[in-house]
Every structure is written in C-alpha cells, then in structure tokens.
Amino acid sequence: MKTFLFTVLCGMLLAGQAMAQAVNTLPQVLDSKVKSVQIAPSSNPYLPPIYVMGSDDVLNITFDYLDYDVHYLRYSVRHCNANWQPSVLVPSEYVSGFNEADITDYAQSNSTFVHYYNYNFTLPNADMQFYKSGNYLLTVYEQDNPETVLFQARLAVCENTVAVHVDATSRTDVDYNDRHQQVSFTVDYKQGLIADPYNELTAVVSQNSRLDNEVYLTRPFMVSPGQVTYDHNRSLIFPAGNEYRRIETVNLHSLNMGVERVQYFEPYYHATLRVDEARAASPYLYDKTQHGHFTIRNAESDYSATESDYLVTHFSLDCDRMTGGKIYVQGAFTQGLPAADCEMHYDQPSGTYTCDMLLKQGAYNYQYLWVPNGSSVGQTGPIEGDKYQTTNEYLVKVYDRPSGERYDRLIGYGINYGGK
C-alpha cells in the first residue's frame, strides 16, 4: 500500500511539473564532440526507431565521441505521451530495473586522422526491458556528470495490436498531380479493443522522418465496426517536395558521388561537394534515395564503425540571395530538423550559399529547406521544388488513451513509400 501511494504521489508531482513548464524533448546534440548519432532497428538501418514489444528486432544505438581519451557514459530513458511531453508514469512502471545504465560497448578509432571512440548499445537489453508502449526520450551523459547531457534522441515502443494501412496520392483535395500529396489511412482493430475511437485515439503523421512538419490528429474522419478511417483532412496534405540529393564519401582516394574533390589540410580531410543548383523550376527527375537517411561506410575497410574518418564537408548552393528567411541543409544527420549548425550563409564573392559540416565517411541524403522568418517549418518549394511524382516516406503512428488511463499507448504504426 505504501509503495502504491508513493507511486501515485510521484506521478502527481511529475504531472504538475510537466503542466507548469513544457520540457524540450526535441532530438538535439548538446556537445559538439558527439557525432553520427543513429537509432534504428537491427534488421534495417533505414526504418524508423520503433521497437515492437516481444520482437527480436531490437534498436541499435550508435554514436561517436571525438576525443583521444575514452569517456565513461551512461544513458537513461523517460516515458513520454504522444505529444512528447513526459508522462506521469514513474520509471518502475515502464522499465524493468532502473531507467539508466552504463554504456559498456565502445571502441577506439583506428587509422583515422580524427580520433574518436565509437559507442554502441541496444534497447531493450538485459539491463532494461520495456513494460509500457509509447514514446521514449533517450538521454546520454557522462557517468560523473549526469546533469550535463551530451545528446538526447527519440525512440518508440509499439504494441502492434492494430493494423495501420497508409496510402498517399498526388490526387489531393487542393490540386491534381501538381505540387502536393495527400495521406489517408485506416486503423483496423478487433472488436472491443478501442471503446471510444473518436475520443481515445491520437494519430501522428510524418514525412521522411521530419519533425518540423509532422501532423497530430485527434479526430478520425469515420468510424465503423472494427475500423477507423482518416481521410479528406486538409492537415494530411503535404507539399510533395523532391527526391533527396545524395553524396558519398566512402573512398578518400577516388571519385565519390556528388564530390568534386577530397583533400587533406591538417588536421582534417576536406570534401568539396559539387555545387548544387536550385531545382524548383526544373522537371522532376527520379532517383532512388533513402528518404533522408544516412549510413556510415568506408569502402576500403571492413570495420566502418571505427575505421571511417571524418571530413569537413563543404556544401554549396548556386542560388540568388533570398530575404525573409534562412536556408538549411536537412537530413537524418541533422536530427531531422533545420538545425542552427546546418544553416547556409550567403557568400557574396561566389554568389552561392555555403555550409561546412564535419561528417563521417558514408552515404548521405540531404535537401535544402527554406524557413521563413517567424516560422519553424521548412519549405521545399522555393529551392527543391514540389513535384507530385516524388517518392516520400510517410509514417503514421497511432496512440490510444482509454478513459481513466494515465499514459498514451502506441498501439500500431504503418509506413507508405509513395505519393504518386
């Protein structure tokens, strides 16, 4: 009884704190020495970071810390609701044991000019099992300085008790085979599983894992026995964008895709990319991409995790100077957001926008987003163009909070690769 009362009181305290001030749970790297953060299922590095309860397909978490000396690090997880604010659950309710553990799997870089340690761990693992589905905020920090967070990232745990069928089309409610794509989806469930679909469910829709333009829905279009339909909703109409641009820096001694030259200037390799052109006025051109993802790879080594070097990567965009906003490089390597260190700056002598980033050898997808002043949502139209034929990744996550429940359960998700 005492344990129950303590749990309830802790939950009420956390709820009060969350209501008093919103917590910043956006993915972000807070220490510039942390690089190449990746979270993905072990079966496919290009799938979203969602673990299905009871599955053997665990999530792999990997990152580098740039230093000559090893740093002893820990991680923790915190349960969040559908809107990514912390839930009222206490750790003992959502994970086994403690909600934090040491990162014990790490290795020093080998034969690289940039010295780093590569860290790896999986979730769930022997130290930590998930009791509850939903969103989880992952935090990594120094063992002896837990208040200083190195980075935080998002992952999810899914029950997979419903089937989510996602469709995307260029025949939208605002135009036909023009500049937009419209998403619709159904949620199929067993009778009795969802008592009040109109009030229990929250659906979250994202395009290419971007966070700046994801959509939250709290009311379905239609409910029928065993099925919920989300359709003809203006919020589900997305600018179509364009196929992601691609570069490769997998080989330091030969030509790479999208790279003009690779040179060494102490202490770094430098990769000067070919100058990009704005594509808004150009016809659509198909290219098979990974929808913004990246992979670490050194073509000259069997141990890419520790034998891939870092290069100062020079992006440049041939574009007239634009006012009233900013241009950003965006991809999974920018945490899916237009980030400050990925802002392009106009170079008057060359007449181009430029940005320099320290990136590990690999294959990268990226695009240029225009963010108007006063907005946090990136636009593809001004630079990349919005082409209805574009193949986009649309992820739909469905959460359920029955009456009287204290947290949002992630009951299912679905992915569509299309839009035509």
Residue ranges and their predicted role:
Residues A82-W84, M128, E142-L150, R210, ...:
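Short acidic/polar inter-strand loop motif in beta-rich domains
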Residues S32-H79, Y176-V187, E300-F315:
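Contiguous beta-strand segments within globular domains
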Residues A20-M53, N160-V174, T289-D302:
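Short, compositionally biased P/S/T/A/G/V-rich stretches that sit at domain boundaries
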Residues M1-V23:
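Bacterial Sec-dependent N-terminal signal peptides
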Residues V157-H180, K387-G412:
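Low-complexity, Pro/Ser/Thr- and charge-rich linker/hinge segments at domain boundaries
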